[in-house]
Amino acid sequence: EGAYPPWNNLNSAGELEGAEIDFGNEACKRMGVTCEWVTQDWDGIIPALLQGKYDIIIAGMSITEERKEKVNFTTGYMTDGARFAVLKNSGLANLNIAGMAKVNLNNAGGKEQAAIGQLIAAMDGKTVCVQSSTIHQNFLEKHMSGAVDVKLYQAVDDHNLDLAAGRCDAV
């Protein structure tokens, strides 16, 4: 993708860099092959693989059942929990949702469901900017539909700019 630092991004010279690039280069070296890096908009990343435009995807992609129906995954190589980001001066900046530091949606019991309910109440009427075709968009549609106004973006950098400009309450 080239737009998801620190995992992958284009530097000022237009070259890909980041943790996934380093990881991929090391894998190519160990396999004794030359790898060519290409960028692809996120919402087309799986379709382009299926069309044979490249051989593998190395991207901050969560392994979901829906995606597993289309492509094969290796063992995950990195984990990064999802979270909301808001401006420091936002009323949302100091939320304490059910006293929980994190909520595991894969094992959402009563306490997790209560936390999601509190989050929905706190975010009611807010605008949340999110990259399209992501698990984050799926979360908003599943858990916060009707409570928040969702604005979709092609790249993380774009929604971050809108957060900084005050055009959304959270990303």
What are these regions (language model features)?
Residues D43-P47, G60-K70, N138-H143, D157, ...:
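A ligand-binding cleft/hinge motif common to bilobed small-molecule-binding domains
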Residues A101, L140, D149-K151:
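A residue-level marker of the well-folded mature domains of exported/periplasmic proteins
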Residues L49, I120-M123, L163:
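Short hydrophobic patches on amphipathic alpha-helices
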Residues V33-E36, D41, S62, E69, ...:
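A conserved helix-loop-strand patch within extracytoplasmic ligand-binding domains
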Residues E1-M61, E69, L152-Y153:
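Extracytoplasmic small-molecule ligand-binding "clamshell" domains
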Residues E1-Y4, W42-D43, G52-Y54, M61-T64, ...:
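Solvent-exposed coil/turn segments that connect beta secondary-structure elements
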Residues Y4-L10, E66, L92-N94, N138-F139:
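Short, solvent-exposed loop/turn elements at domain surfaces
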